[in-house]
Curated annotation (Swiss-Prot):
Gene Ontology MF term list: DNA binding; zinc ion binding
Native organism taxonomy: Viruses, Riboviria, Orthornavirae, Kitrinoviricota, Alsuviricetes
Pfam families the UniProt entry points to: Carla_C4
Protein name according to UniProt: RNA silencing suppressor
Organism: Potato virus M (strain German) (PVM)
Cysteine disulfide partners in this protein: none
Length: 108
């Protein structure tokens, strides 16, 4: 939400300098449609850090370090299984901001 507001202010400022009109509602809707800024926690380091924080493998989303019952993960050449926990995968890949619904989605 904070990134959307920053982008909306930048768009509104650019609109004001180019056309002379300041319409924040239009700039905010453009910023919402633009999506996430570049980077945004999607690096390999960030994925590995989030996976370690919940004791999962960053490649296949299984428990790491493996137990006696989890033999398919070697943390180098593993792939996700047929049915894996989508919420865990979403948290590892995109971070906590994508797992928790935003305030705008709750109102609709």
């Amino acid at each position: 939400m904070k990134d959307v507001t920053k982008v909306a202010l930048l768009i509104a400022r650019a609109m004001c300098t180019s056309s002379g009109t300041f319409v924040f509602e239009l700039a905010f809707s453009i910023a919402e449609c633009a999506g996430r800024p570049l980077g945004g926690g999607r690096s390999k380091y960030a994925r590995r850090r989030r996976a370690i924080s919940i004791a999962r493998c960053h490649r296949c989303y299984r428990l790491w370090p493996p137990t006696v019952f989890t033999t398919r993960c070697d943390n180098k050449y593993c792939v996700p299984g047929i049915s894996y926990n989508v919420r865990v995968a979403q948290f590892i890949d995109e971070g906590v901001t994508e797992v928790i619904p935003s305030v705008i989605n709750k109102r609709e």
